[in-house]
C-alpha cells in the first residue's frame, strides 16, 4: 500500500471513530438525564472514553499519522513493526485515569454540596470562578510547554522515540500526559456547563482543535 493511501486510510478510520463517538454521545444525551454522578463508575468511564475519542481524536490525528509514518519507514529498514493501537491505547489510558479522578472529584463535590448549602446558593459564582481559572491557566508556562509538544508531532517523535511495544506504549503515555496538560481545565468547564451538554462539548472540541 502506498504511503498516501495508508495515511488516508488511517485518517479516515480515526475520523470515523470520532464521528461514531459523537453519534453515541448525542444518543446518550437524548435518552438519559445526562452523565450524572448517580451512574456507576464503570458506565461513567465508558462514556468518558467515548467522549475522549470524539473530542480528542481529531486533534491527536496528526501525531498518530506521524507515528504510523515512522513505523512504516522503520519496518522498511528491517526494524520490528509496532501497530498504532499500542500508542493509541496508552494515550487513552491517560484520559481514562483522568476520568476516574473526575468521577471521584464529582462524587466528593456532590456530597459536599449536600452538606454545605452555601455551595448550591453560589453555584453560578463558583462556575464563573472555574472559567476564570481556565482562562488564567492558558497563560501559564506549563500550558505553553504542553501545547508546544502537542503542536509539533515530528519533534515529539524525534525526541521521544522508543523502540518496541513498551516504547510505543511509553510514547503514548507521554503524549497523553502532554495533551492532558493542555486541556484538563477545559474539560473541568463541562461541569458548570453540563457534562453531557453536546453544544459545550462541540465548542470545546473546536477550541482544542484550533489551538
Identify the residue ranges that each predicted region occupies.
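Residue-level signature of transmembrane alpha-helical entry/exit and packing/kink sites
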Residues: 10-14, 40-44, 83, 87, ...
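A small-residue-rich subset of transmembrane alpha-helices
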Residues: 77-108, 181-211
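Alpha-helical transmembrane segments of helical membrane proteins, especially in multi-pass transport
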Residues: 137-145, 167-195
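Juxtamembrane transmembrane-helix termini in multi-pass membrane transport proteins
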Residues: 45-92
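Transmembrane alpha-helix/helix-exit interface in multi-pass inner-membrane proteins
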Residues: 96-111, 123-152
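Alpha-helical transmembrane segments
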Residues: 39-56, 120-136
